[in-house]
């Protein structure tokens, strides 16, 4: 209703008006802090998306974000892919209003906590403790607390660099050798009365996405992490590779791969 009636959007085509609704809803959503922790770490974007929708903010903001080069420009999020050397993405802030708007930049670089060999569902914020986040472009400053001002009826672009360091690399090697997600939010905290805060989620995978095996280790070789893969009798459910004359409850050791017998 706002987009259809507000003069700020009058010059947009019907398609652009549909897209800007999504931009405003996602861009003004509020990232939520993980209630199970006291560290202040946010829930991962993989768990909360762009955050909690703030209807008041979405219907009053004159500024909305887009991610440069995003497959869907109406969805302000940065999909970074996999790798270990870091990522760069650009966020453009579009100001439809008649007054400039100023924001202070902050961010979190989240990676899921591993405990006892298992992912816990909660994350650690590695920013400043193994992952460096810096800003460029229109940002006045490169670190946390940098500011950016969007001129009236104008737009500016801020560059964001996510750089994993050796401390984070060591943690991943020790706890998630097949790689792990590194994601989070870049937040634009409003310093202009009447303009809501903005946020853009990003998602990267530290490592090689294709490295992790689809199946756990074979029962015949040992070393399974959670549940060993094996071949079973389709009728009885018994594992192949054991002497069938020995009762299931009395079998010991691992199945012998050279004893698999399959026939039609």
What are these model-derived regions, one by one?
Residues 23-70:
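Secreted, periplasmic, or luminal enzymes acting at the cell surface/secretory milieu
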Residues 37, 115-119, 212-216:
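Outer-membrane beta-barrel and related beta-rich outer-membrane complex signature
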Residues 49, 87-95, 184-189:
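Buried hydrophobic-core signal for structured, non-transmembrane domains
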Residues 55-101, 107-109, 172, 214-242, ...:
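Beta-sheet-dominated interaction scaffolds and their linkers
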Residues 89-95, 160, 262-264:
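Aromatic/hydrophobic beta-strand junction motif of beta-rich domains
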């Amino acid at each position: 209703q706002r987009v259809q009636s507000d003069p700020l959007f009058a010059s947009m085509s019907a398609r652009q008006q549909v897209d800007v609704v999504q931009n405003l809803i996602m861009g003004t959503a509020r990232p939520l802090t993980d209630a199970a922790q006291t560290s202040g770490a946010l829930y991962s974007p993989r768990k909360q998306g762009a955050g909690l929708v703030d209807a008041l903010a979405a219907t009053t903001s004159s500024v909305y974000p887009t991610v440069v080069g995003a497959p869907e420009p109406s969805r302000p999020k940065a999909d970074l892919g996999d790798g270990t050397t870091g990522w760069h993405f650009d966020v453009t802030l579009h100001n439809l209003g008649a007054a400039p708007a100023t924001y202070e930049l902050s961010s979190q670089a989240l990676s899921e906590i591993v405990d006892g060999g298992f992912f816990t569902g909660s994350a650690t914020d590695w920013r400043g403790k193994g992952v460096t986040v810096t800003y460029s472009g229109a940002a006045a400053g490169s670190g946390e607390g940098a500011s950016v001002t969007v001129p009236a009826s104008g737009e500016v672009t801020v560059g964001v660099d996510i750089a994993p360091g050796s401390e984070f690399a060591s943690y991943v090697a020790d706890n998630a050798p097949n790689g792990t997600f590194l994601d989070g939010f870049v937040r634009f905290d409003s310093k202009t009365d009447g303009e809501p805060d903005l946020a853009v989620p990003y998602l990267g995978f530290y490592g090689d996405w294709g490295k992790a095996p689809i199946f756990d280790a074979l029962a015949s070789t040992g070393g399974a992490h959670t549940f060993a893969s094996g071949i079973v009798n389709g009728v009885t459910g018994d594992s192949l590779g054991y002497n069938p004359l020995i009762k299931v409850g009395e079998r010991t050791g691992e199945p012998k791969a050279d004893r698999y017998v399959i026939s039609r």
